[in-house]
């Protein structure tokens, strides 16, 4: 906006979809907006949800109501009943639960929306954007340019497409990574003449070739990506360095490695601040989950976690709600246990403030948090989808549209991560596209095979964290963890439980079970306890 003002262009306005909606809806209706949305326990209390005899059912229902509202508000549908919420539920246990309580969930979803509409309670950001779409606004502009179109929701697009102005939508369909926020493939929905902007002045042709090589993996899921990128960037002096991961867990593992092994790194910075990686959107923290793990419920601050009597109850809640953030926290707690406070303390001691970000020796970020940003050199964490994993999953899903979309987004995540660099990249060999020529700007990190000597690898420093709580020392290998635990967040389906039971009865130890199922030892022990295998089979 400042640039337009400096040029004397007073007839140009820069708005987000939400800022437009806010002016048209919130002001005119005198609504009060709830900044952070409603927490699960708040929804349960507001609607007077009942447990119906099933453990924590009121909170599980509230979780699905929250997601159903988000699904509806981001859609272009006029009524809640025009959507089938079950279509976006994939976990078998979650699907069973939602099927059982579907009418109840739908009815209470409509009730919560009605309360917001009448002004009985504060409205959410999703709500006023949805209401903006439903009133079919006529915007008095001659030209409308929609940037970052690949991230648009169906509700945003509906408003955009209905305008009489000359419309332009800009975006990169391969940078669509917000499917979990119900972003749609908007660029393909726009029946406009296409003009390709295929030249990047950020990076060189070698990096462009790497990015295109990743996009070619889409052929595995039968998606054509005939996308040519011309890299016109020039090599620059290395100032900013970043570590980019797919998940919070992958990023935390790498950060621990830097603060415990690479002592020379004194100043680090987390995009979005370190606290955002230790707290879930709902407010639960790693410390809450750790307190539950240690059976010290009196120390738990989050109301939802405090309702859980054990880790098993929390994991059951996670399975029935598909709460990915809580699931990751459980994995971290089971892996690091009481070392977590010292780990977070060590990271925070080296973390610098936002104003001093340029002085950070290393920036840490997930792909979602650094989208739109750039760094001189980057290191990719080994927690993205590999060609081998992609081929395996593609054979399993049998052209299910929902899962194909998720795999497409997994490829996009790696593509977005790679294209954050301006000069060079350090990337695990498992993530390298086949038949790519060598380059001085692309540094391949060797990933050791399981049988190889750990000390012989080029990028597998042993990770040791000492605490005063138990006097023990535990060693971790970041890439080994990712290799072993590649299925850590995959739901425990019935066939997997049967396989686990058989192997347990055959005397296979926990370490080998963890390796076989691609999960942590803590997760295996938890499942053995949940299935009561020790009680049944000794």
Where is each model-derived feature located?
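P-loop NTPase Walker
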Residues: 1-31, 212, 419
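Conserved helicase/translocase P-loop NTPase motor core
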Residues: 97-162, 342-367
